[in-house]
Amino acid sequence: MSRENGAALDFTINIDATADLDLDTHHAEALITVQSSPGGTSAPAGRIAEVLIMDRSLSMKGQRKINEARRAARAAIDALPEGALLAIIAGNERAVCVFPPVQGLARIDAEVREAAKHAVSGLMPEGGTKIGQWLAEASGLFLADPTAATVRHVVLYTDGKNEHESAAELGSTLDACADQFICDVRGLGDDWDHVQLRHIAGKLHGDAEAVLRIEDLAGDFTRLMRRVQLIAVPRTYLRLAPNDAFRITAVTQAYPVEVDMTQHQRPGGGTVIDVPLGSWEERETRRYQVSLRFDPAAVPTGEKLRAVRVDLLAEVANGTRVPCANAPVTVFRHATPGDPTTIPESITQVHDQREIGLAIRACVDAWLNGRNADADAELDVALRLARKSRDPRLPLLEDIAESGPDGKVRVRGALTPGEMKKLGLDSFKTALPSSHRPPARPEDQPAGQPPDDVDKAGERAAGPAMPMAAGQACGICGEQNEPGSAHCVECGNRLRGRGVA
């Protein structure tokens, strides 16, 4: 479709849904699989605008950290193509643009490249950490090139916690920056906040990773600069237009990284919502889970009904959003009591993967807060769930596990906080079914991480629909939820039932 609409990629949408609904149920789910392929116009997209944010707070002093950070920044500068736009921010409790010397972005040529590398060489650590201030400064710099086709990208690293601004202040900045640029974030060493970095990356459509060895930062930055050059469409949107009888209660990116996108949605007119999806490369696959609620009295029985129209929109060079693909979410409500709702295997897998991630994060949180018995118990749950479903995160769990004197699983000794925080970030990573999972690209696969099959993925899972068993009631609002649900569809409360055999 790209030849007609001006987008650089073609997109396809496939949908699995809880299509056969129990007469008494009042909610449904859909799993939307979006795939990109080379389109009619040449990729990549327009020029790149890159902002490097360097943490220069006092905690960067010692252990060669500031020297390696300078080396990483120079490597990133060398990896950017001629003609790209560049700025460099040095951040502590203030954000200072150290390059270019005048406000805005500099177009890279040989002279600019050398000047930029010289600018980072004199940075010395001092002061505290105020990440929201850094991101706000980057947002202002991008105003120098508001062209819709420009790929606006930020790389941010930090080795500490955001101690000089409140969570509300950071949240306000993230809301203002959302859909304005992509931000990849990196945590160095042991003292950063993995929950905070995952939140930043999720809000700004980037990746959050741990760099445990500071000397690996330069290679990581080089990979990021090469990756940004592969972006073909800078901004895309999932438009969800529900039938009048339905309302959307939650939207979650389910693959390749789990991200709650419910708060990302923007009004699209009437009951329609647009969910920003960020940028796309060729041959990417992503999955989005949509939760729906309806009044049974408003949905007829015995006939197929379109619950939601799904459109994928891409922003093209003139700034308009053009439709690239669409598909319906259809449901069928049984007329006879006792006919069970059926759940496609692909949706069951999403629930299973989410439960594993929740158990891993509970383990990490307990360990970091000194609750070792709780950490051991959550690790045991995560291991059993991962083994049962052959989850790709299983090797990561086995790497931190050992048997105690009583024969029970426990978190092994000699782990560092950085290693556990890395596991916390990796817990959000999910996979396609193994039968459709291609090998990762070697240059994009950091050591010790789950398979990254973002770039080349096959068809969606096509398993048989599974009957829904008795649900579990939410302890907060009393809502009955499907088995395997991680959160209540009505109030969002975490459901603790795991049902491990």
Predicted regions and their residues:
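Intrinsically disordered, low-complexity acidic/polar segments
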Residues: D22, G39-T41, C97, R247-T249, ...
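Predominantly extracellular/luminal cell-surface or secreted proteins
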Residues: N14-D16, G91, A241-N243, L313-E315
